[in-house]
């Protein structure tokens, strides 16, 4: 595997860090990854190692306000136009690597916050990709999201768009953690593998909190993608792989992801597969201790291979 880090001009000419991990031999396919909230693209190197062994190149970038990009070091925030800009950033990476390898089937993976970005991206570019992997996603009742948006808007008025508050911390992370009391850390809901959780918390490229503004943007996206007609404009022939832990509060312990599956089937999608993993929490890519992460990697390798 060969890794290349690079900097590119994102939407609005914002400089963003990206990387691509290339197989030693010919490129059979490309997987573009959009990472989750507060983390960065470098956390997917183990997954990329297995994919590159099969000739699948892996590319991605640190979302604005995340990872190696210039920003506040403790709070992830994408700026007032950041959600829309990030969708455009995703398309710039697609254009870059599809342009280099126009004959390689192109797949996209979105995890957590990245899953909601990907779901919106597919609505805008339904014909671009060969298949989509949507991991760590969910859906919530619209009225609940509206109430939360209103509360968060009061916090934006109080402390600003790019800052956070104790109430936003509670709504964004701590509520999820309540399901796993007694808790060792603020982030027990992410992963049951304590070694991996400690690695995440000690990673200087990971943020500790999200801004009130970014949380409001995420809630807005959750509302948009949660509408029953949200997938109507997608390519119904495109293979879709849904992945989630059965103990993931973002996916309502599996129930929300099943709801997404049923909605897609109702709208006539031909090839949707759901993988729910027992005893796995939100970050299925780092649940190594109970074997989930290895199963997830093997499934992705197999699924892409079957759809090339």
Residue ranges and their predicted role:
Residues 1-25:
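N-terminal cap/lid segment of alpha/beta-hydrolase-fold proteins
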Residues 35-39, 112, 246-247:
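Active-site glycine-rich loops that stabilize anionic/oxyanionic intermediates
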Residues 43, 48-73:
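Conserved alpha/beta-hydrolase
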Residues 79-99:
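Alpha/beta-hydrolase active-site loop
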Residues 101-112:
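Alpha/beta-hydrolase fold nucleophile elbow
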Residues 120-205:
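Alpha/beta-hydrolase-fold enzymes
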Residues 242-244:
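Short beta-strand/loop motif that positions the catalytic acidic residue
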Residues 267, 271-308:
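Catalytic active-site module of serine/aspartate enzymes centered on a nucleophile-bearing elbow/loop
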């Amino acid at each position: 595997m060969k890794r290349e880090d690079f900097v590119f001009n994102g939407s609005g000419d914002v400089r963003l860090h990206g990387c691509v991990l290339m197989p030693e031999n010919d490129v059979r396919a490309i997987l573009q990854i959009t990472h989750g909230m507060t983390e960065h693209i470098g956390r997917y190197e183990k997954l990329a190692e297995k994919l590159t062994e099969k000739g699948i190149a892996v590319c991605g970038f640190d979302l604005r306000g995340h990872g190696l990009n210039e920003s506040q070091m403790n709070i992830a925030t994408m700026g007032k136009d950041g959600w829309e800009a990030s969708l455009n950033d995703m398309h710039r990476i697609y254009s870059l690597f599809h342009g280099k390898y126009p004959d390689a089937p192109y797949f996209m993976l979105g995890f957590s916050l990245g899953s909601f970005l990907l779901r919106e991206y597919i609505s805008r570019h339904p014909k671009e990709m060969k298949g989509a992997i949507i991991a760590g996603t969910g859906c919530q009742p619209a009225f609940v999201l509206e109430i939360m948006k209103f509360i968060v808007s009061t916090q934006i008025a109080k402390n600003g768009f790019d800052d956070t508050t104790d109430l936003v911390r509670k709504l964004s992370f701590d509520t999820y953690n309540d399901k796993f009391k007694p808790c060792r850390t603020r982030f027990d809901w992410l992963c049951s593998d304590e070694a991996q959780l400690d690695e995440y918390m000690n990673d200087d490229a990971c943020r500790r909190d999200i801004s009130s503004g970014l949380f409001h943007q995420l809630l807005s996206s959750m509302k948009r993608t949660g509408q029953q007609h949200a997938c109507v404009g997608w390519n119904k022939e495109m293979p879709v792989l849904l992945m989630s832990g059965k103990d993931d509060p973002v996916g309502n312990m599996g129930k929300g992801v099943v709801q997404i599956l049923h909605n897609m089937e109702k709208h006539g999608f031909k090839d949707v597969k759901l993988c729910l993993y027992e005893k796995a929490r939100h970050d299925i890519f780092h649940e190594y201790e109970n074997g989930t992460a290895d199963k997830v990697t093997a499934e992705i390798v197999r699924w892409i291979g079957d759809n090339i």
